[in-house]
């Protein structure tokens, strides 16, 4: 007795065998998290229209709860000096806050992260407004922290220091300013 085999069935069985054999390959190594491209590869964060990091001086003052703000320098790097009154203690002196914004148009996120670690900062990876970012806490002459993100064609940072004050959380203010910059629309 002869068995009749359908040619379509032979092709189907052969395709399944080839597919299973091809999909059973073992790959060595370890998994690494994908690094997505920045969400805004062509956006500029430079100094324009008397704004640093796309933010007006008044919005920076409000964001950190300061009473006064002065910007002694503007350009690729913008420097601010702010003062914030004491919280509930009329006898305490006001807190002086130093803030620096920088945007390096062709900067490298990995380079900035390596430099922060090399200089002794405690580096914490995070994501801010869909951008790969890190916080770098380094208290030398007061509580200080920078929030840095890959953005546009480069990297931008907000650095906040509570001058002469060992306590407080400058990372909260730095991350808030970074978030405001990344959300800003011109």
What are these regions (language model features)?
Residues 18-22:
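C-terminal motif of bacterial Sec signal peptides marking the signal peptidase cleavage site
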Residues 65-136:
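Short, solvent-exposed recognition patches
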Residues 48-66, 185:
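Amphipathic alpha-helical segments
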Residues 31, 58-64, 84-93, 153-154, ...:
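Extracellular/mature segments of secreted proteins
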Residues 33-51:
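Post-signal peptide N-terminal segment of mature Sec-exported envelope proteins
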Residues 117-186:
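A short, solvent-exposed beta-edge/loop patch
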Residues 24-27:
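Bacterial signal peptide processing site
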Residues 1-13:
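Bacterial N-terminal signal peptides that target proteins for export
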